[in-house]
Amino acid sequence: MDATAFHPSLWGDFFVKYKPPTAPKRGHMTERAELLKEEVRKTLKAAANQIKNALDLIITLQRLGLDHHYENEISELLRFVYSSSDYDDKDLYVVSLRFYLLRKHGHCVSSDVFTSFKDEEGNFVVDDTKCLLTLYNAAYLRTHGEKVLDEAITFTRRQLEASLLDPLEPALLADEVSLTLQTPLFRRLRILEAINYIPIYGKEAGRNEAILELAKLNFNLAQLIYCEELKEVTLWWKQLNVETNLSFIRDRIVECHFWMTGACCEPQYSLSRVIATKMTALITVLDDMMDTYSTTEEAMLLAEAIYGWEENAAELLPGYMKDFYLYLLKTIDSCGDELGPNRSFRTFYLKEMLKVLVRGSSQEIKWRNENYVPKTISEHLEHSGPSVGAFQVACSSFVGMGDSITKGSFEWLLTYPELAKSLMNIARLLNDTASTKREQNAGHHVSTVQCYMLMHGTTMDEACEKIKELTEDSWKDMMELYLTPTEHPKLIAQTIVDFARTADYMYKETDGFTFSHTIKDMIAKLFVDPISLF
């Protein structure tokens, strides 16, 4: 496939005209959800007396997408769990779930808690599938040097794969095993986990009916908000007249919104999703122009225009770039209007992040033209990490968030802290693993995969395996940094981890953004199909 022959939009004007079937019931659903929230709150408070019950309830609320309604209660419960020794430390399920939830919420818990579950020869002693699943998920919150967690993943994966061959394994549990082997719980997109887990929870014997009903209502209400946002961003996108003026780019506005919703799914982040969706779409145009369509001279003209950020620079650009450049400037200005006078300063950081992205892309063009191969993967990532766009998109989501994200937070982000680099590295390595064959055939710059092949004389398959190992190392970097206290809001670190999850999802088997038919069904589940209440 030629890199400039991307398939057309799969959605077109669908969300401009779409009327969700649940919209007329919005008032009733909201009223019912408010009643159920308080009922579930009482259940959560009652669970404080028993650690296992508390852990089970917290993980259930998280998987159903309800935890944001109970942030204070959950934080308080987990502080109690962290300080209490009143639990069975010989119960692997409890130990694993406790470890998972505490680390996920930023508590430093030692992985030594798992050594007691090994025999004298250092092998894990466990054959219960539910315990294996929980241990496997817990182990993925590992950092560097935690050998016991590395070993736990190897052991549990082997055991879980074997369990799938057991005809006596309950079907529900087998489905959970298959899903977990594909993507461990910590790396799943939270909103998609809710979609997948609601029907599973509905079949569990110990389900709480109030929680189940609330989860369904909560999703359907969120879906209505997403559809309103999709109408807005689709109308915004149509003004670019992509089909006529930019037919060579990836026309993916719905997929952009899907990506942003995967990272920031809570209703209160509506403006954040809209701004980040627009920025992702604009970054996609920039990438396709500079990477696959423009001549070197044209790409450098566009880069210089973005560095200067002046309207009159459009006069120096070729026709197909001119309208895009002016629309880019107009969009950033309109974001400032939406943010209001007290937060409009944030658009400065959108511009600065875009400039960093363009510098990285310019360096890659230079490599391509000179047939230059970076000497190390680190050298490659220094330039290709920023150009992948993941961090710029994450930062654009912060622009639309509340006042807890301060000017100091944005200044810190502009220094590209190590947490940011771990996100960029994960996104770049995943992107290269998924798309390297297509891009090399299209004459792109050397990817990290190709770089490794040339450095070590390996095959592409061998290089891809090594890049996957480096990706795991970057996840360990991220987890280590996530657990390190900083003066900045925890929301920043949490959102950066969420964006790493979206990269993992979009590039799991192939480039799901470019070849978006691979994610079309999931997009429909998120935006089109309401969950039945009965």
Swiss-Prot record:
Motif (DDXXD motif): 287-291
Any one annotated GO CC term: cytoplasm
Subcellular location, record wording: Cytoplasm
Alphabetically ordered keywords of this record: Cytoplasm, Lyase, Magnesium, Manganese, Metal-binding, Plant defense
Binding site for Mg(2+) 1: D287, D291
EC numbers: 4.2.3.47
Keyword Ligase among UniProt keywords: no
GO molecular function, a single term: terpene synthase activity
Required cofactor(s): Mg(2+); Co(2+); Mn(2+)
Sequence positions that bind Mg(2+) 2: D287, D291
GO biological process, one term: diterpenoid biosynthetic process
Pathway: Secondary metabolite biosynthesis; terpenoid biosynthesis
Catalytic activity: (2E,6E)-farnesyl diphosphate = (E)-beta-farnesene + diphosphate
Binding sites annotated in the UniProt record for Mg(2+) 3: N431, S435, E439
Organism domain of life: Eukaryota
Record function comment: Sesquiterpene cyclase catalyzing the production of beta-farnesene and alpha-bergamotene in equal amounts from farnesyl diphosphate. Involved in indirect defense by producing volatile signals attracting natural enemies of herbivores.
Record text about domains: The Asp-Asp-Xaa-Xaa-Asp/Glu (DDXXD/E) motif is important for the catalytic activity, presumably through binding to Mg(2+).
Family to which the UniProt record says this protein belongs: Belongs to the terpene synthase family.
Protein name: (E)-beta-farnesene synthase
Organism: Zea mays subsp. mexicana (Mexican teosinte)
